[in-house]
């Protein structure tokens, strides 16, 4: 099965173009103001114009007021919501949009129980645990992922072109999600890194 690829944290037209040209399946926009990758819904609406049909638009939120999420959903065609804070299932389900729930993996976290708390989530996005919110570019121990996880698995956390092939072969996620691993600086993407990452995923797919 083809591993889906999401490039997250885009802020510039040329970076959206590069991700689409490389073959990304989804483009993620960060609507979390403290993040250096933050874009306003109005700015994202401009960037979305460069995304062709059948490439998903993902909106990432962290403990946001519901009205803010609704405003973003009205401003641009978000296909999937992604929640990275302390949101519960009732919160995540209220927007009538498919959603991913992020889990920050650490020893002691029961991922099966966590996934069971979000039965209507389209998938569980697994990231490394860091203090505060947002990705830290760290890889977590993939052996902490249980084989009986009752959700589609999206793998994130410290992925790069160098390690994503191993990740795809070992974890077999339905999708991989990358931000800092394809950056020149925070919020600015490196187009050669994007192309190399996508190529590494496709090569791994061919070997499975």
From Swiss-Prot:
UniProt GO MF annotations: phosphoribosylanthranilate isomerase activity
Catalytic activity, as annotated: N-(5-phospho-beta-D-ribosyl)anthranilate = 1-(2-carboxyphenylamino)-1-deoxy-D-ribulose 5-phosphate
Key word Transport present: no
Pfam family, one: PRAI
Keywords for this protein: Amino-acid biosynthesis, Aromatic amino acid biosynthesis, Isomerase, Tryptophan biosynthesis
Gene3D superfamilies noted in UniProt: Aldolase class I (3.20.20.70)
Keyword Amino-acid biosynthesis part of the UniProt annotation: yes
Pathway listed: Amino-acid biosynthesis; L-tryptophan biosynthesis; L-tryptophan from chorismate: step 3/5
InterPro entries: Aldolase_TIM, PRAI_dom, RibuloseP-bd_barrel, TrpF_fam
Family: Belongs to the TrpF family.
HAMAP family referenced in this protein's UniProt entry, alphabetically: PRAI
Classification via NCBIfam families: PRK01222.1-4 (NF002298), PRK01222.1-6 (NF002299)
Protein's recorded name: N-(5'-phosphoribosyl)anthranilate isomerase
Natural source organism: Dechloromonas aromatica (strain RCB)
Lineage, opening ranks: Bacteria, Pseudomonadati, Pseudomonadota, Betaproteobacteria, Rhodocyclales
């Amino acid at each position: 099965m083809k591993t889906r690829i999401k490039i997250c944290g885009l802020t510039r037209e040329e970076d959206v173009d590069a991700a689409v040209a490389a073959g990304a399946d989804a483009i993620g926009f960060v609507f979390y103001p403290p993040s250096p990758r933050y874009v306003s819904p109005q700015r994202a609406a401009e960037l979305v114009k460069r995304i062709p049909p059948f490439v998903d638009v993902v909106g990432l939120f962290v403990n946001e007021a519901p009205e803010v999420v609704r405003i973003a959903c009205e401003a641009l065609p978000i296909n999937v919501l992604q929640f990275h804070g302390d949101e519960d299932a009732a919160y995540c389900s209220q927007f009538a949009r498919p959603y991913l729930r992020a889990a920050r993996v650490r020893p002691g976290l029961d991922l099966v129980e966590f996934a069971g708390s979000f039965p209507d989530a389209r998938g569980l996005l697994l990231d490394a645990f860091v203090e505060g919110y947002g990705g830290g570019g760290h890889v977590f121990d993939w052996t902490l992922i249980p084989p009986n996880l009752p959700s589609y698995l999206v793998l994130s956390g410290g992925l790069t072109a160098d390690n994503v092939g191993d990740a795809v072969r070992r974890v077999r996620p339905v999708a991989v999600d990358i931000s800092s691993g394809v950056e020149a600086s925070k919020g600015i993407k490196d187009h050669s890194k994007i192309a190399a990452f996508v190529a590494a995923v496709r090569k791994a797919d061919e070997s499975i």
